[in-house]
């Protein structure tokens, strides 16, 4: 679902945003094409990356990570091949990036807070402020080196308007608007030198990248400590990071009573993100009479997300009470073996040099 009001009022573009992509994190201007070689149209592409915030030791570590992410995607824009002219011209003139998180559940578990905890909302606010600040700072630095993107004048950034100016002020009811970084100086630098990119941030589902990084999915609470992910290569078992030391700190999806905590987490993130967040609503029928989720509950969640400035939403998840068990020849397929494995991990030493890299 794409909420066009928020997609445009809280956008970095002066041009209208009319739609999002399948995963609901991309909110870029588009224009129709008359034929395959039509360069006057605009096809928006997903130029994405994600930072594993679960591994962060301090917020200022984001400065280098954001700079590397922005510079890597900056080179990718010029390096990759484009089969359609409207995609190439739009991407190279706007140079829109979408960098997000993986491992947020791990990050909150390390801090000892649950998604429903107001302290978690404050931590996410501080994290996302630092994240967007350093992304913009990196793009501004590249603009000093290479020049601003071709369509920079068609962004609100060119007028010194930042995401902290256009977000839904109802978010201040969740976390007070106390900012920790020097946004005024950054605003002046952006007005003077521009940005190399029209957008910097977007929160994708990140199913694949989280597996490769052994991180929790994007900003999602895990469904269980041990999950099984299916792919063309076959099933893959994945255990939440630092299970041994953080088992009791993780927020599991179906243990959450309602969507309030998650909605608030996404809201404070959207305050700073210049594209959208692939957010979900999750319902456990077991929490309601007769295992029936009331329409009024879902309607209330919809209205709440609108109030707090969500731009898009992706899935409505429902707990079907089915396990992730699969039939395959493996030495941990039985529940008893899984429990033994988790118990072994719970007592294992996790601070080895290899894990610290």
Place the predicted regions along the sequence by residue.
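Alpha-helix capping and helix-loop boundary segments enriched in small/acidic/polar residues
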Residues: 35-39, 56-64, 87-99, 111-130, ...
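Catalytic alpha/beta core of large soluble enzyme barrels
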Residues: 24-27, 32, 73, 77-78, ...
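Internal maturation/activation junctions in enzymes
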Residues: 66-88, 114-206, 278
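Acidic, low-complexity intrinsically disordered tails
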Residues: 326-357
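Function-dense linear segments that define catalytic or interfacial modules
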Residues: 4-91, 96, 101-111, 215-218, ...
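Extended, hydrophobic alpha-helical segments in both membrane/secreted and soluble proteins
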Residues: 100-103, 135-139, 298-301
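Hydrophobic, well-ordered secondary-structure elements that form the walls
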Residues: 48, 104, 207, 305, ...
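Active-site loops and adjacent core secondary-structure elements that bind or stabilize anionic groups
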Residues: 1-2, 207
């Amino acid at each position: 679902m794409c909420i066009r009001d928020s997609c445009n009022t809280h956008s970095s573009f002066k041009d209208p945003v009319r739609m999002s992509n399948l995963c609901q994190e991309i909110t870029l201007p588009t224009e129709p094409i008359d034929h395959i070689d039509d360069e006057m149209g605009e096809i928006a592409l997903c130029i994405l990356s994600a930072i594993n915030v679960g591994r962060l030791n301090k917020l200022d570590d984001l400065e280098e990570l954001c700079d590397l992410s922005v510079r890597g995607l900056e080179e990718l824009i010029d390096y990759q091949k484009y089969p359609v002219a409207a995609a190439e011209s739009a991407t190279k003139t706007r140079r829109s990036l979408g960098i997000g998180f993986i491992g947020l559940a791990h990050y909150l578990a390390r801090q000892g807070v649950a998604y429903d905890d107001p302290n978690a909302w404050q931590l996410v606010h501080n994290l996302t402020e630092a994240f967007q600040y350093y992304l913009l700072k990196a793009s501004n630095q590249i603009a000093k080196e290479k020049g601003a993107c071709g369509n920079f004048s068609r962004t609100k950034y060119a007028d010194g308007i930042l995401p902290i100016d256009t977000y839904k002020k109802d978010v201040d009811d969740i976390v007070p608007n106390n900012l920790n970084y020097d946004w005024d100086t950054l605003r002046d630098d952006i007005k003077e030198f521009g940005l190399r990119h029209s957008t910097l941030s977007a929160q994708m589902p990140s199913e694949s990248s989280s597996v490769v990084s052994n991180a929790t999915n994007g900003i999602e609470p895990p469904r269980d400590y041990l999950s099984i992910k299916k792919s063309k290569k076959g099933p893959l078992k994945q255990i939440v990071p630092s299970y041994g030391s953080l088992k009791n700190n993780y927020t599991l999806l179906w243990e959450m009573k309602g969507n309030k905590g998650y909605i608030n987490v996404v809201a404070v993130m959207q305050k700073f993100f210049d594209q959208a967040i692939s957010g979900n609503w999750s319902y456990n029928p077991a929490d309601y009479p007769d295992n029936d989720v009331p329409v009024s509950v879902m309607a209330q969640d919809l209205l709440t997300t609108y109030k707090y400035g969500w731009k898009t939403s992706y899935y409505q998840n429902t707990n079907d009470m089915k396990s992730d068990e699969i039939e395959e020849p493996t030495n941990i397929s039985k529940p008893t073996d899984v429990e033994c494995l988790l118990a072994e991990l719970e007592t294992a030493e996790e601070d080895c040099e290899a894990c610290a890299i």
